[in-house]
Each structure stands twice: as C-alpha cells, then as structure tokens.
Amino acid sequence: MKILISGGAGYIGSHTLRQFLKTNHEICVLDNLSKGSKIAIDDLQNIREFKFFEQDLSDFEGVKALFEREKFDAVVHFAASIEVFESMQNPLKYYMNNTINTTNLIQTCIQTGVSKFIFSSTAATYGEPTTPVVSENSPLAPINPYGRSKLMSEEVLRDANMAHPEFKYCILRYFNVAGACMDYKLGQRYPKATLLIKVAAECAAGKRDKLFIFGDDYDTKDGTCIRDFIHVDDISSAHLAVLDYLENNESNIFNVGYGHGFSVKEVIDAMKRVSGVDFKVELAPRRAGDPSVLISDASRIRNLTSWQPKFDDLDLICKSAFDWEKQC
C-alpha cells in the first residue's frame, strides 16, 4: 500500500512515521515544516528511504497535482494547528488550517481514488464532559475553536463517506499525548510547546525557569485539571492498528487513551521524582478553554483492533520526556 503521512515531520507524525517505516508499505511524507522538524525527517531516512514533500495543504492545486502524480492508496492526516489557548486568540487560523485544509484534502482523496483516511482528531471535541469518563458516544460539545475545528472535520469525513462509500475513514480522538520515543531518537522538538509533560521536562532539564499551574480551583481531587496522558509510541501504534482494521471493516471512530487520569500536580510530582530536580512551580489564573477532567473510555479500539498499549506508566512517560530533553 502507498501511504501519505501529512504532518509527518511533527511530534506525533514523526513517531508514527517511524513505526510505518518498519512495515512493507511505501511511505511518503508531506509537511510544510512550520512546526515540524527536518532533523527528524533526515534521521528517519536512516531506517529506509522515503519521499518527502515540503508543501502546504493550503496550496490546493499543488496538493492535487501531487496526488494525481503519486497515486496514494491511503492518507494518515496529522497536519494541523493544535494549541487550545492560541485557538481562542486566533480562531480563524484554526478553521483555515484544520477544517478548510482537511476538507480540501478529503476532496482530493476522493477525486484521486484514495480509499482509506486516518484522521488525527482530539478529545477536545467532547468539551466539558458531564461524566468523568467519555466514550465515542458521549456528547460532543467542544468549548474552544481547536476542538470545534476538529469536530467540523469529523463531520466532513462522515458526510463524504455517506456520499462515497468506497472512501473509508477512521477518526482517532487522542487524549493527552506525551513522552518521547523509547530509544530517545525522537521527541517533541517544537520550542514553544505547551503540553504539560513537555514543559515539565524542559524545566527539569534547565531549559525553562519555571512551570505555571493554570488554576487550582477546579472541581477535582487537588483543584488542578485531570487528563488521560498517553505515551506517544502507543498513540503512533494505534494508527497502524486502525489502518489494518479498515482492510475488512467499515469506517469508525476511536478514542485513544489509557482510561485513567492524573492531575497537573501529580504530573509535576512524577517529573520531579524521575528527574531528581525540584524545579520551580508557580500558580497562574485559569486558561480559557480548559475543561476540568478528560478521561477516555478506550474499550472500542482495544476490542475491535489489534492495538495493545505498552507504556501505560506515568513515571515511564515522564522519564522518556526528561531523557529526551537532556540529549536533544
């Protein structure tokens, strides 16, 4: 199978690319390198060579010409803007990059005969859940433009599939992705990251002066937000599992998480424990768009696909992130 990975130079995209390169599929990557890493792309060429296209999805005609020339069988779509707080400040950027570009990509896939589409979505589509644990059937009520832009893209996929049943998709709603590749050759390189474990690892490695806790008055056990943190290698392996699933099954939506959560304070304690560094932490006001609790019910992907997570351990996730920061 010939597979295009959009956003394959990014954090999750590059880890997924690494796993796909160990298969027999022909792999190509498209990325505009606005936040992705050419270093990661060059390093991954050492596993085996693959085509890399430095291109922006907003170049609709260029993307269509690429698809007509390369004749892909499947697309794994990561390319997106992903920062919740930024989406509150600059919503149109998110609707352009996430919803409009994804819609164009879906149209191009249908026009050029792509039959399988794996979409990188988010637990932010659930908004502020009415229950601590959310399944794929839980109400969808995103509370920020990032979540809404992803949900709109999900709806485009459903409608496209209804009109074109030969075009099948799987939507993966990620929970909080964290950590680094377990051989430490890959990690998150973006210098302005806002993900909690990444920021905590940077503090422990001396790359940041302090970590801010954004609110300690949430309705949780210690007043800080609770999230379902999942190791990036387990997220990346889920894409292989759902691509295999689509061979003999219809389109579907899957939560990808571990099914239990940790608070911001618990994550900070874990990072201090594994690093041995008592870095500075300060309290700050709540950020707009942050729900208090988000925990997955991921039983569907476990029951229907071959996905078996291997790194469900907060200390292990924190240590992998810290070790990456020390050497990158």
Predicted regions and their residues:
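Short, flexible, glycine-rich and Lys/Arg-enriched loop motifs at helix boundaries
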Residues: 38, 175-196, 206-227
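Residue-level signature of the cytosolic catalytic core of signaling kinases
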Residues: 59, 189-193, 260, 310
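C-terminal substrate-binding subdomain of Rossmann-fold SDR/epimerase-dehydratase oxidoreductases
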Residues: 199, 205-328
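Glycine-centered small-residue hotspots that permit tight backbone geometry or close packing
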Residues: 8, 36-39, 55, 79, ...
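N-terminal Rossmann-like NAD(P)+-binding domain of SDR-like oxidoreductases, especially those catalyzing
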Residues: 1-180
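Short-chain dehydrogenase/reductase
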Residues: 95, 143-151, 186, 190-198, ...
